[in-house]
């Protein structure tokens, strides 16, 4: 387990978590650990129902001692059906209009695939084009108000854009 001292704490009825800001200031790692009494419903909620932006916006200042497992996850997903289910349909039609991008015709999208890889280790985080180093705060903490978050069971994570609070990469670690 990696140990990290953070200052952004997240807690509600379902999750306890933290935000770890990456060097450079553009992105942050957010981890949400389901509370033990909520763990049975965790899989129902996991990614689809987790509003990462709302959690990012709800963070509050606290001294947080975070324990993070080293992990690496790679996934391959076929997203054609998902794209169509959210209304992106015309690009799959043989009559799709791509005239604003090319003069070559006829063009259509046959499938949408995604390969995602995230690796969190002592050197930092690598996810697609996102990388970071761990930074430790350097002031004396108020020991009575320290929050402890140990990611020792399945949890949700996201790499979020700090300006918008929106995830650029998200997933679930279900095996430690």
Enumerate the language-model features and the residues they cover:
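Secretory/exported precursors with cleavable N-terminal leaders
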Residues: 1-176
């Amino acid at each position: 387990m990696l140990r990290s001292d953070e200052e952004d704490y997240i807690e509600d009825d379902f999750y306890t978590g933290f935000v770890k800001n990456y060097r450079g200031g553009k992105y942050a790692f957010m981890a949400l650990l389901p509370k033990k009494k909520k763990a049975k419903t965790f899989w129902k909620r996991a990614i689809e129902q987790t509003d990462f932006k709302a959690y990012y916006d709800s963070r509050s200042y606290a001294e947080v001692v975070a324990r993070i497992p080293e992990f690496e996850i790679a996934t391959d997903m076929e997203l054609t059906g998902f794209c169509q289910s959210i209304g992106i349909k015309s690009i799959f039609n043989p009559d799709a209009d791509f005239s604003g991008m090319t003069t070559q015709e006829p063009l259509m999208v046959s499938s949408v695939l995604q390969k995602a890889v995230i690796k969190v280790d002592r050197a930092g985080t690598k996810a697609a084009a996102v990388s970071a180093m761990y930074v430790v705060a350097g002031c004396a903490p108020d020991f009575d108000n320290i929050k402890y978050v140990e990611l020792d069971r399945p949890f949700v994570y996201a790499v979020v854009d700090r300006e918008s609070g929106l995830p650029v990469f998200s997933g679930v670690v279900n095996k430690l």
